Every structure is written in structure tokens, then in C-alpha cells.
């Protein structure tokens, strides 16, 4: 695997025969091709891009790079210049980077990896960097683009050619920084090959995606690849996480030229969180760092968000921004959409919409809300589990809900191609006395809002910012935030 842009001879990619590429866009989806664009055709996760060469040519492709596996042959009827490259599936990002002129070399690219927290941290880094004088682009789950103007996306980390095209466009639009969520799928499928990462954050490693990775060991090994990236200058690691603490030790041994910064509540952390306080108004903490000590108070909720703030402080200070200014701008940041998103109406329950879809994330979200729950009030949890994903996670989610909430409503998430009732039945053994079982998620949300007391807190977990529900392969319009708003309006 080639993680970082290297000379052509070292990557094994031959000298590119694509002339006059400057200004052209590359795409691996033939439907995006416009007159003069370049098509990159290689086998993908679900389809073989080489099957779509005729469509790309019909749409105006001026050049085609294609995966030369020794079996596929170029059809002379496709009368456009072309070049076959071996193992293009894993080299597409490097190829695109070279065609675009290595644009990520001219950006401060910050990567964020880990099971939970990637979206919040990338969006906070973008907001903070903008306030510090940068122009920061975002690549991640909620969308790609600039803060306040994100375009929806289907993948946390896009396809390799799309990643490079995004970076090229961002640079054209004046970006100086790119904050990127780096998923385990993205690392495993070579989607970020060719990206010059300057700094990287590791948030945590908890159970997720085992339907894909198989074991936690394999999952962790893939996550750690980002921190061995050629040219990486700073690694920022959560040492409150067991895997993170181990990773710090390995990196200090294996990468003597890498600046490694640990963060967390641990007394051994380089960026240590102390004097933490939490209320319904937000959190505050003192951060002891190699650059000095300071306090930050924000409207964010949760102990885990203090850890996320520490990660941001470490990365920003490592990149040369003064600690006092970093703390000042972080106090002004807004939560990412669907991440501990509070909907408050006077005389009605506080409803919090969060993307928590792993046992660890659900446990932490509920613990946060228990801390701020009024005396005598109840904490509700409305959640489900995604279909066609790790079945072993379902009872663990149920157990986390029972442990952390006073009242549990079990419902659907994105059932995908599974029967919603089958998914619920996998959850229920861990939820012996649910308040309600309702497969219709909208009805489940309305039930909780209608039945909760005025001083109760309701966590709607799992979908966060998503504006759809995937049922039998069809994405129907659905938003937890919208359903909650409507339910609060009609509550008597």
C-alpha cells in the first residue's frame, strides 16, 4: 500500500501519458463526467468502473485511466486517449494527486480517526481555524465543503479520486486547511492514498464495523495506519482509551521523528483535563498543556466532549497557534449537527438528538445526560440498531440503554434490507422491561415526547444529522430533528 505521494518510480505507476491535464477534473463515477473530464475506471466495492467506460466517453471524457489486470482489453471503438495502469484500485488516489499537481502538499491537512468523535472534532477544528485566520474545508460524515455550506455525502471518507478532486476544488476556492474524517473503511480501501497529512488525531477504539473488519484487532490495526503515514508531523492520541495508550507507546518507539501528544483525564497525558464541571448550560475545564495552562467554558455537553476539546487544543497548538487564542476560539464553537443537539421548549422535556450508534457512544451520551438531569426527573432513551450490520452489537446497545436510562424505547434505525422486527428481537433480550417497543421510529419518538414529564430528558440516539431512513434499499425522507420539533409543537 502506498500511503503518501511518492515519486512515480517508487509507486510503480508509469509516467502518465495524460497531456494537458491542468484544469480538468477527474471522476470515478461516469455520471459525473462532463466534456473534457478524465475518467478513472477500476474495480470498486459494488461495481467495476471499467464497465462504464462507454458511458464516460459518451458524456465527454477526454481521457481514461483504466485498471490493467491482464484480462481487460481496451476497445478501439472507444476513441479517446487512454492509459492502463496495474492495480489502479489501490493507486487511484496517488494517480489523481499527481494529475492535480499534489494539491494536498499546499494545504494543512488534518486527519481524524477513531470510532467516535470524528465529526465533532473535524467541525470544531474547522470553526476554530477559521476564527484563527485560516480558510478551512471539511471532509466528513455530515458533508464536504466549508463550515455552514456543506454538501451532503454518502460516505464519511469519499472514494480516492473524489478525495483528490475535493482537495483540488478546495484549493481553488482559497482553502488553507482541510479537516478530514478518516474512516477505517477509507484506510482499508486506499481512499486517502496520495493525501499529505500534516497532523492526525486518534479519538478511541470501541466496537463497530465488525461485520466488515471481523475482529477488534483487525479494526485497530487499520485505524493505526494513519499514524504511520509518511510525512506526518503530529500525532494526537487519547490515552484515556486503552488502545490509544498502547498506540502512544508504539509510536514513540517506532517513529522517533514524529511529535506525539497524548490527551485525556489521565495524569500522564501531555494535554491533561482537570477541574471538569458539567451542567445543562455546558462544560468547563482547565487544560494543562506543554504550551501553558488555561480554562475553557463551552455550551457543549459531556465529559467526552472535554476530551474532544483537548484533542483540538493539542492539534492547533502543535500547528503553531497560541494557546490563549485557541482557548478563546474554542469557547465560541457550535456543536456539529445531530451531535448532542439540544431542542428546548419552555415547559416541555429537553430532547437531545445524537448520532450515538455504538454501545460506547450510547453509554457516554446517557451518562452525560444523567449528570445534568433534574432531581426526580427521568432520562428516556429512544434507539434502534442498523440493519445488515454487526448483529453482535445489538444486545450490547440494549444493555447500554438499560444501564444508562430510566426508561427505554426500542425502535428502528436504518433497517436496510432486514425486517425491523428481527432487529428489535435481537435487542430485546438485553432490555427486559422496555417502556415501549415500536418499530415505527417516528411513532416511537412521538410516544416519548408525549409521555415524558416536563422536566424529563429524552435522548433520541442513532441517526443524528441524517435526513433519511433506509428501508429495503430505499432512502425515505426522515429526520429525527424534524420529528422532534413537530412532536414538541403538538404536545399538550
UniProtKB/Swiss-Prot annotation:
It catalyses: UDP-N-acetyl-alpha-D-muramoyl-L-alanyl-D-glutamate + meso-2,6-diaminopimelate + ATP = UDP-N-acetyl-alpha-D-muramoyl-L-alanyl-gamma-D-glutamyl-meso-2,6-diaminopimelate + ADP + phosphate + H(+). Pathway: Cell wall biogenesis; peptidoglycan biosynthesis. InterPro entries: Mur-like_cat_sf (IPR036565), Mur_ligase_C (IPR004101), Mur_ligase_C_dom_sf (IPR036615), Mur_ligase_cen (IPR013221), Mur_ligase_N (IPR000713), MurE/MurF_N (IPR035911), UDP-N-AcMur-Glu-dNH2Pim_ligase (IPR005761). Keywords: ATP-binding, Cell cycle, Cell division, Cell shape, Cell wall biogenesis/degradation, Cytoplasm, Ligase, Magnesium, Nucleotide-binding, Peptidoglycan synthesis. UDP-N-acetyl-alpha-D-muramoyl-L-alanyl-D-glutamate binds at residues 30, 156-157, 183, 189, 191. A motif (Meso-diaminopimelate recognition motif) lies at residues 413-416. One of its GO terms (cellular component) is cytoplasm. Meso-2,6-diaminopimelate binds at residues 389, 413-416, 462, 466. Its cofactor is Mg(2+). It is an enzyme of class 6 (ligase). The modification N6-carboxylysine is found at residue 223. It holds the Pfam family Mur_ligase_M. Catalyzes the addition of meso-diaminopimelic acid to the nucleotide precursor UDP-N-acetylmuramoyl-L-alanyl-D-glutamate (UMAG) in the biosynthesis of bacterial cell-wall peptidoglycan. NCBIfam families: murE, PRK00139.1-4. Belongs to the MurCDEF family. MurE subfamily. This is UDP-N-acetylmuramoyl-L-alanyl-D-glutamate--2,6-diaminopimelate ligase. It comes from Neisseria meningitidis serogroup B (strain ATCC BAA-335 / MC58).
